[in-house]
């Protein structure tokens, strides 16, 4: 199913994969999502500052890490919601009483976003067919209309949050092709998460080995040390197995919409939907607008003798990193470098003249 855009899991960037799989193109990067998260953090900071920048609540707030992003690549539902807004899309919780009153059959929707802890993935309809676009899978998974409602119900039983995406999604080749092509059955995609599990096991065992090695170097080895080492390994295996069991059940649950194990021959073409010039222009306008708004908000919130950058929360935003770099390179540093180069050139010319 090559004409369906499907980003696979890289690190913990599932929010990015979820959005791009929904929109069917490389519409969002980690830097752009971090920019949205930083904007949300700043808006929250300004609201807290209304109670006074010296209040205990405000100072305690500044010490807390961002709730909209972290160093692993996780982004909050607020970031996802704001990212979708400038495409004219909004998300509604599937269990929202107002939504449930409408009595809409899930198969009449266009897409869903699902979340459990720090994992996000998309379920989307192309033409007449539903597909699970979980980035933990090696490829898109067909979900029959009859299985969709049960699939969503099982996700919620497993403590998943399910959100309905409202609005017109960008046009894509997959949607056009699957309006005219009928898909009866297709191969169940392989799990893309096994590699992640093995990497986690390796990290756990390596940590245990390093810890035991350090203790052995300090106090020497003995039979008791060997027993403790084996016990630590066994405990780490049990803990990893518990975590992996949950990961496996999560992946298996996401695959229960599959309706068969054979595939119909379909034309294979490369996806033509990654961000075109028009989406790029829209994105540039969007982020430029938010940057201008943020500058205006900072100017309004700044108090005499206080700079807004002194009151920012811990963040890994690319904007903050760029700001730090620019502050480090002062005019005096540049001038000193120029003076040094000129002095070296003068000495070289003097030596050549004497020769």
Swiss-Prot record:
This is Ataxin-3-like protein. Its EC number is 3.4.19.12. Residues 209-230, 253-331 are annotated as: Disordered. It catalyses: Thiol-dependent hydrolysis of ester, thioester, amide, peptide and isopeptide bonds formed by the C-terminal Gly of ubiquitin (a 76-residue protein attached to proteins as an intracellular targeting signal). One of its GO terms (biological process) is negative regulation of TORC1 signaling. GO terms for molecular function: cysteine-type deubiquitinase activity. Deubiquitinating enzyme that cleaves both 'Lys-48'-linked and 'Lys-63'-linked poly-ubiquitin chains (in vitro). Acts as a deubiquitinating enzyme for the transcription factor KLF5, playing a role in the regulation of KLF5 stability. It is an enzyme of class 3 (hydrolase). Residues 253-276 have a biased composition (Polar residues). Keywords: Hydrolase, Nucleus, Protease, Repeat, Thiol protease, Transcription, Transcription regulation, Ubl conjugation pathway. Residues 278-293 have a biased composition (Basic and acidic residues).
């Amino acid at each position: 199913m090559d004409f369906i855009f499907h980003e696979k899991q890289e690190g913990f960037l599932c929010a990015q994969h979820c959005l791009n799989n929904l929109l069917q193109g490389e519409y969002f990067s980690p830097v752009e999502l971090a920019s949205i998260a930083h904007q949300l953090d700043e808006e929250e900071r300004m609201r807290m500052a209304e109670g006074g920048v010296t209040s205990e609540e405000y100072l305690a707030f500044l010490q807390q890490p961002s709730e909209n992003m972290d160093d692993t690549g996780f982004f909050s539902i607020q970031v996802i919601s704001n990212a979708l807004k400038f495409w004219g899309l909004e998300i509604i919780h599937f269990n929202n009483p107002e939504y449930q009153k409408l009595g809409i059959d899930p198969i009449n929707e266009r897409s869903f976003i699902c979340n459990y802890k720090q994992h996000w993935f998309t379920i989307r309809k192309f033409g007449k067919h539903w597909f699970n676009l979980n980035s933990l899978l090696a490829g898109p998974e067909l979900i029959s209309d009859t299985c969709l409602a049960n699939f969503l119900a099982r996700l919620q039983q497993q403590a998943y949050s399910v959100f309905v995406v409202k609005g017109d999604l960008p046009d894509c080749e997959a949607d056009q092709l699957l309006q005219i092509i009928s898909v009866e059955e297709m191969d169940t995609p392989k799990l893309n998460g096994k590699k992640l599990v093995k990497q986690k096991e390796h990290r756990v065992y390596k940590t245990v080995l390093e810890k035991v090695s350090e203790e052995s170097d300090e106090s020497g080895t003995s039979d008791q040390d060997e027993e403790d080492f084996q016990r630590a390994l066994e405990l780490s295996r049990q803990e990893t197995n518990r975590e992996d069991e949950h990961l496996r059940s999560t992946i298996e649950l996401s695959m229960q919409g599959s309706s068969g194990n054979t595939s119909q021959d379909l034309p294979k073409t490369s996806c033509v939907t990654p961000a075109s010039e028009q989406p790029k222009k829209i994105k540039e306008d969007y982020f430029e607008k938010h940057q201008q708004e943020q500058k205006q908000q900072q100017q309004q919130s700044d108090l005499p003798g206080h700079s807004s950058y002194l009151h920012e929360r811990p963040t890994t935003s690319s904007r903050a990193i760029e700001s730090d770099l620019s502050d480090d390179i002062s005019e005096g540093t540049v001038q000193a470098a120029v003076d040094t180069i000129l002095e070296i050139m003068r000495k070289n010319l003097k030596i050549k003249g004497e020769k």
